[in-house]
Amino acid sequence: MEKEMEDKEEFDEGEIEYTSYAGEHHLPLIMSLVDQELSEPYSIFTYRYFVYLWPQLCFLAFHKGKCVGTIVCKMGDHRQTFRGYIAMLVVIKPYRGRGIASELVTRAIKAMMESGCEEVTLEAEVSNKGALALYGRLGFIRAKRLYHYYLNGMDAFRLKLLFPKPRVPQIPSQVQTQQEYETFPRPRVP
């Protein structure tokens, strides 16, 4: 427990600055964080695929100029659904447990909702208790277990967040209107 406290970086929440992906100068920062913290190796082409096609779904967190967290997402059609997907989420260890990951995910979800996504999915290692707890607090459910999903042989949970359907006012059909018209009592004309 003492070691954990020593490893924590001291800062006020207001010192963390969040920004959207703003160009090629952010790419090495994202790559460095993901490469050092996630189990899956990604090529430069994978990173570029996400940040060039969906820069509005990529966010970075900075503390005093140092990149301490990032989220990389995409969106597109999946079966009959327009779906958002969280591909990568990283917060470096000294900054974990302080709300940075929640803020990054919340910003990405908001951008996906505003773009018309109906749901968001992702995969997380079954052993990644921190990630599973984070996504659970944000309303994600475990939709499926994926056996031997990762290159390291670990299983994953597919997590899903469903957005509420927008309420559309019901407009009566022509048939209903005609039926109502025919059954509506009319005044008698003398």
Swiss-Prot record:
<feature type="domain" description="N-acetyltransferase">
    <location>
        <begin position="16"/>
        <end position="164"/>
    </location>
</feature>
<dbReference type="GO" id="GO:0004596">
    <property type="term" value="F:protein-N-terminal amino-acid acetyltransferase activity"/>
</dbReference>
<keyword id="KW-0963">Cytoplasm</keyword>
<dbReference type="InterPro" id="IPR016181">
    <property type="entry name" value="Acyl_CoA_acyltransferase"/>
</dbReference>
<comment type="similarity">
    <text>Belongs to the acetyltransferase family. MAK3 subfamily.</text>
</comment>
<dbReference type="InterPro" id="IPR000182">
    <property type="entry name" value="GNAT_dom"/>
</dbReference>
<keyword id="KW-0808">Transferase</keyword>
<dbReference type="InterPro" id="IPR044542">
    <property type="entry name" value="NAA30-like"/>
</dbReference>
<keyword id="KW-0012">Acyltransferase</keyword>
<dbReference type="GO" id="GO:0120518">
    <property type="term" value="F:protein N-terminal-methionine acetyltransferase activity"/>
</dbReference>
<protein>
    <recommendedName>
        <fullName>N-alpha-acetyltransferase MAK3</fullName>
        <ecNumber>2.3.1.256</ecNumber>
    </recommendedName>
</protein>
<dbReference type="GO" id="GO:0005737">
    <property type="term" value="C:cytoplasm"/>
</dbReference>
<comment type="function">
    <text>Probably required for N-acetylation of some chloroplast precursor proteins and efficient accumulation of thylakoid multiprotein complexes. In yeast, can replace the NatC complex (composed of MAK3, MAK10 and MAK31) by acetylating N termini of endogenous proteins and the N-terminus Met of L-A virus Gag protein. However, the formation of a NatC complex is not required for this function.</text>
</comment>
<dbReference type="Pfam" id="PF00583">
    <property type="entry name" value="Acetyltransf_1"/>
</dbReference>
